[in-house]
Regions:
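PRPP-associated nucleotide enzymes
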Residues: 1-186
Length: 188
């Protein structure tokens, strides 16, 4: 039996300005906890992790003068729910123009939820080589983990229920900038 979700309320969690300030803080944390930018590279998980990783790299460049490599990772083939994605999932290519071997990698995504996306991303990275270290940076951590995965860099922790949805909207993809919590009521 299929459950339908009806949105009862939308509550803004972050405005465009707050997203900008949060990304600045995260960029500084990444550099500080990495002991600088040596061997550092950012890898955005397609879709919304990509513009977030690019913005983090720009902030690092603006503050340190160092161009940190940025890559894009498509995890479609590594998902454990591929059969539920659809009969013909769209596969994009990875765009990682640097060796991941012995790199200090920071995976970047918009929302951390069950951890399954991150597990798939790590599998994809290990197929490309052997990084020195992999850490995770997320804009929102909403809890409800199904995997033993924890973010090293978190923009905001948000307590949610399983019926709520965290929607990240970024200007590069959505034409607007905000993070919203959709509070719904599941019914049959």
């Amino acid at each position: 039996m299929m459950r339908e979700m009806r949105v009862v309320e939308k509550r803004q969690l972050l405005s465009a300005e707050e997203i900008g300030r949060t990304l600045q803080r995260l960029a500084h944390e990444i550099v500080e906890k990495s002991g600088g930018t040596n061997d550092l590279a950012l890898v955005g998980i397609r879709r919304r992790g990509v513009p977030l990783s690019q913005r983090l790299a720009k902030t690092i460049r603006d503050s340190s003068g160092v161009n940190v490599p940025v890559g894009t990772l498509d995890i479609t083939l590594y998902r454990d729910d591929l059969s539920t994605v659809g009969p013909q999932p769209v596969i994009h290519s990875n765009e990682i123009d640097f060796s991941v071997d012995d790199r200090d990698l920071v995976l970047v995504d918009d929302v951390l939820y069950t951890g399954r996306t991150i597990r798939a991303a790590m599998n994809g990275l290990f197929d490309l080589g052997r990084p020195k270290r992999i850490r995770l940076c997320v804009l929102i951590d909403r809890g409800h983990r199904e995997m033993p995965i924890e973010a090293s860099f978190v923009g905001r922790n948000v307590e949610t229920s399983d019926t709520e949805i965290v929607e990240v909207r970024l200007k590069e993809i959505d034409g607007e900038e905000r993070v919203v919590l959709e509070i719904g009521r599941a019914h049959v």
